């Protein structure tokens, strides 16, 4: 390192502590980057890569950005998942001896960004910290640096459960210890696309102990300690706005796994990953940024406590029924800025005068809001506003201190009102009168010289001057002015009198700017005292905003208040998919009932493609979520239980698990539901088994249906193209066939989008192909092939084999191999015996025929089957073993 110049040596020393970040190294008016940072930054930011002499034999790669434009470049890098260490000059270069002293003043990361275009005003920017313990449990702590919010929870489930909870936070960055499992880190980065950071310190930092007073569990304290230590190490500034840590328990909320949330498009669409077109987009009628953030948090964690849900519903009903109250509240909320993030900026010391003006305007609305809510005869409303302080003294302070139209910068003056500070008023008097004198001098000199174009101007280099065009120089009295500067078309002069006034004016103006800055920073410290009250107020206003948002959308879209029941029954009359209905924008939407009494657990749904099966299934899930976040629902009547979990497998999700096939994704999602669902869960399976051969798919579909029906008892919508499965209605007493109706008119299919009882009689696949405008010749050929296939043998679903519950694992009997042969009912067609296919694809002979002798290969496979311990295998392992044996039999 000694071969480099002292400045480059200094750079390398600082860089050694920030190997995983771009180092923005301040040199004068630029932030410079060197070596690999420069090469990579030039590529990512599309800026010029140059080089400089650094003392070594080879030139050093270098690139840089102007300091005043650095914010934009830093945002670009952080948006791409990088970290940026900002290294500033911490001493005056004019007085420095040797190399100017420099220090990193902040490490900016995806989870610690405070402002900029990467921070959506209606989304939290959570930083997560995950701690793994020897007993297999995890503690997850989260902090939103922009709002000061802190949460922590203990997780004891699988890695998938951990992923679900981290996903629910929306975190872009997660902090772990340096020994954290690499496999688990890979899942976080691949599935959730997160930036990984490391922090080994877990003790609560000095000065922050008061934030964990309500946290007693050592595991939770460790997770919070890791989080706080990382924040302090990276931010290096005041954290006065951090709020007390809130403990929450995941079993207090409905569980919806990561893939189900995406399938249902709760907060973003599958295709575009955008909010528009999601349920959140429809429900978001909030008027404040903080209300928008709370709405998203509620949607990520629907409630499962009936009483809490009903409290919200009653409050929404109050707003629905009182139009004037609702509209008045909305008008006031429009004037409320982001109190949470304003408080954060105050604490961080980067609040400006305009921010404080926004704070004052917000606080002016608060007394009327609190008074209106206090008049409601509602226990929830009374509890909500209890302890809310309108901060009227702060409103008064800001009202008499901050100008109505202050500049963005706090270093340019013109911030503080007249009358706030006596000394400032005196300086302003001198400055103002001095400028009046300058204007009078200009008029007097014009009169004396007769030069109408004479003017008095000012610049920072020469100060005040008298400017005369060259055409008028001859009119000047000789010796009146002292020449100061020559321009192309004019001459500039000064006088002793002008210089005297200039000194008085400039001294006053300099003192004004400095005093205003000092007064503003003192004011900012006074505002800091109110941060806890502002944060409490923000929570109250956010919650009111979400509730009025629910009321507004419910009124606009004609939603109804759901009735919650402790019974396991669903009664939805004229239910609609809220987002599809909205997107149709006035076109007729066909509503559908969903009526599942306590003794009805499974709807087996058949019908053609494009008929609306998936929409109907999603519709039920969205109605359920809306109900349990406290919103009215799209129906004319709704009676619903409180579900503990929602599981889905509904198309378009094949890319969600990296590197997995469609069929594997199906099986993994099916396994998740089967392993975790309870009788209080909702399961939505769309076309399970489509990713493999017909017989395998049908076998698995039947087995899954039977297992859910017999062993779980969850309310389930199961759509299928295997029409043969509809006979299960005869043997499963809590299963009912329903179908989406369609009719043919003039050889073309017309989808009615109406759910009706019974099984569908046709799939209309070729008609759908016609709608897609496939070539006529291809359609004609498909019809010929279909006619041939329909004339062939019929597939018969095997009878169920009753097995005791303890003998079953996840996939029930039709695919469980036993030593005794399974009797398969025979069907006769045209008085001829029809041979049937078993679930292994091997042809079974009619009972009237003698069983053929097994060859050596078949005997070997049978021996292997007998040795399989099915009770010690997962469904996926059983399926893989089945494929292996089948493949072995098929080899010639």
From Swiss-Prot:
Record protein name field: DNA mismatch repair protein MutS
Source organism (scientific name): Bacillus anthracis
A cellular component term, taken from the record's GO annotations: cytosol
Region (Disordered): 833-855
GO-annotated molecular function: ATP binding; ATP-dependent DNA damage sensor activity; damaged DNA binding; mismatched DNA binding
Residues that coordinate or bind ATP: 607-614
Protein family: Belongs to the DNA mismatch repair MutS family.
One Pfam family matching this protein: MutS_II
CDD domains per the UniProt record, alphabetical: ABC_MutS1
PANTHER family in the record: DNA MISMATCH REPAIR PROTEIN MSH1, MITOCHONDRIAL, DNA MISMATCH REPAIR PROTEIN MUTS FAMILY MEMBER
Gene label: mutS
Cited function: This protein is involved in the repair of mismatches in DNA. It is possible that it carries out the mismatch recognition step. This protein has a weak ATPase activity.
Protein keywords: ATP-binding, DNA damage, DNA repair, DNA-binding, Nucleotide-binding
Record-level GO BP terms: mismatch repair
Compositionally biased intervals (Basic and acidic residues): 845-855
């Amino acid at each position: 390192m000694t071969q480099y110049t002292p400045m480059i040596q200094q750079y390398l020393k600082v860089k050694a502590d920030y190997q995983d970040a771009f180092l923005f190294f301040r040199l004068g008016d630029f932030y410079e980057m060197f070596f690999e940072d420069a090469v990579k930054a030039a590529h990512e930011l599309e800026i010029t890569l140059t080089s400089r002499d650094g003392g070594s034999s080879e030139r050093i790669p270098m690139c840089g950005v102007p300091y005043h434009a650095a914010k934009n470049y830093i945002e670009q890098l952080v948006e791409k998942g990088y970290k940026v260490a900002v290294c500033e000059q911490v001493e005056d270069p004019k007085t420095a001896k040797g190399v100017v002293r420099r220090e990193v003043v902040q490490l900016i990361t995806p989870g610690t960004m405070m402002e900029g275009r990467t921070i959506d005003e209606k989304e939290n920017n959570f930083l997560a910290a995950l701690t793994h313990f020897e007993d297999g449990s995890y503690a997850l702590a989260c902090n939103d640096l922009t709002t000061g919010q802190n949460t922590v929870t203990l997780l004891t489930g699988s890695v998938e459960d951990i992923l679900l909870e981290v996903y629910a936070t929306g975190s872009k960055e997660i902090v772990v210890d340096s020994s954290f499992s690499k496999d688990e880190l890979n899942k976080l980065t691949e599935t959730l696309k997160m930036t990984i950071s490391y922090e080994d310190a877990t003790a609560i930092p000095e000065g922050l102990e008061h934030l964990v007073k309500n946290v007693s569990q050592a595991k939770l304290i460790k997770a919070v300690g890791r989080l706080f230590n990382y924040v302090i190490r990276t931010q290096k500034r005041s954290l006065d706005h951090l709020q007390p840590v809130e403990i929450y328990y995941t079993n207090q909320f409905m569980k919806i796994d990561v893939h189900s949330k995406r399938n249902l498009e709760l907060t973003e669409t599958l295709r575009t990953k955008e909010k528009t077109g999601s349920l959140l987009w429809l429900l978001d009628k909030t008027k404040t940024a903080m209300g928008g953030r709370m709405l998203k948090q509620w949607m990520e964690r629907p409630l499962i406590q009936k009483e809490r849900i009903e409290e919200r519903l009653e409050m929404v009903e109050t707003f629905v029924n009182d139009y004037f109250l609702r509209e008045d509240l909305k008008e006031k909320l429009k004037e409320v800025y982001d109190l949470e993030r304003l408080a954060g900026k105050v604490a961080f010391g980067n609040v400006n005068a305009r921010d404080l003006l926004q704070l004052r305007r917000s606080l002016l609305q608060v007394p009327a809001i609190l008074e209106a809510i206090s008049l409601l005869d509602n226990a929830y409303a009374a509890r909500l506003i209890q302890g809310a302080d309108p901060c009227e003294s702060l409103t008064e302070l800001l009202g008499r201190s901050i100008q109505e139209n202050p500049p963005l910068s706090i270093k340019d003056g013109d911030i503080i009102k007249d009358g706030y500070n006596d000394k400032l008023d005196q300086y302003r008097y001198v400055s103002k009168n001095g400028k009046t004198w300058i204007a009078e001098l200009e008029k007097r000199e014009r009169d004396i010289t007769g030069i109408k174009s004479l003017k008095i101007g000012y610049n920072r280099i020469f100060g005040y001057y008298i400017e005369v065009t060259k055409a008028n120089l001859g009119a000047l009295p000789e010796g009146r002015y002292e020449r100061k500067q020559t321009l192309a078309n004019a001459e500039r002069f000064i006088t002793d009198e002008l210089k005297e006034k200039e000194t008085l004016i400039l001294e006053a103006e300099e003192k004004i700017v400095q005093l205003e800055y000092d007064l503003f920073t003192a004011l900012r410290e006074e505002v800091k005292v109110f941060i806890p009250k502002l944060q409490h107020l923000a929570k109250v206003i956010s919650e009111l905003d979400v509730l009025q948002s629910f009321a507004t959308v419910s009124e606009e879209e004609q939603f109804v208040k759901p009735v919650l029941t402790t019974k396991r029954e669903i009664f939805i009359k004229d239910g609609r998919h809220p987002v599809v209905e909205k997107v149709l924008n006035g076109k007729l939407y066909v509503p559908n009932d969903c009526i599942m009494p306590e003794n009805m657990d499974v709807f087996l749904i058949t019908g053609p493609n494009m008929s609306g099966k998936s929409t109907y299934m999603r519709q039920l899930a969205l109605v359920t979520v809306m109900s349990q976040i406290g919103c009215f629902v799209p129906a004319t009547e709704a009676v619903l239980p409180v579900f503990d979990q929602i599981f889905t497998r509904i198309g378009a999700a094949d890319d969600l698990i990296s590197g997995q096939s469609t069929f594997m994704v199906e099986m993994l999602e099916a396994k998740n539901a089967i392993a975790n669902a309870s009788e209080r869960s909702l399961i939505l399976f769309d076309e399970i088994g489509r990713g493999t051969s017909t017989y395998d798919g049908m076998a698995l579909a039947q087995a899954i249906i039977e297992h859910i029906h017999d062993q779980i008892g969850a309310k389930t919508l199961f759509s299928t193209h295997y029409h043969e499965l509809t006979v299960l209605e005869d043997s499963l007493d809590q299963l009912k066939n329903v179908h989406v109706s369609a009719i043919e008119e003039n050889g073309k299919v017309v989808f009615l989008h109406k759910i009706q009882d019974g099984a569908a009689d046709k799939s209309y696949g070729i008609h759908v192909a016609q709608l897609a405008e496939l070539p006529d010749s291809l359609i004609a050929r498909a019809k010929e092939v279909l006619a041939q296939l329909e004339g062939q043998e019929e597939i018969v679903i095997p009878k169920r084999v009753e097995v005791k519950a303890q003998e079953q694992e996840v996939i029930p009997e039709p695919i469980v191999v036993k030593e005794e042969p399974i009797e398969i009912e025979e069907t006769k067609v045209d008085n001829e015996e029809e041979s049937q296919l078993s679930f292994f694809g091997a042809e079974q002979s009619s009972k009237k025929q003698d069983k053929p002798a097994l060859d050596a290969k078949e005997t070997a496979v049978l021996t292997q089957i007998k040795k399989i311990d099915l009770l010690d295998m997962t469904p996926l392992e059983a399926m893989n073993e089945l494929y292996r044996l089948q493949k072995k039999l098929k080899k010639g």
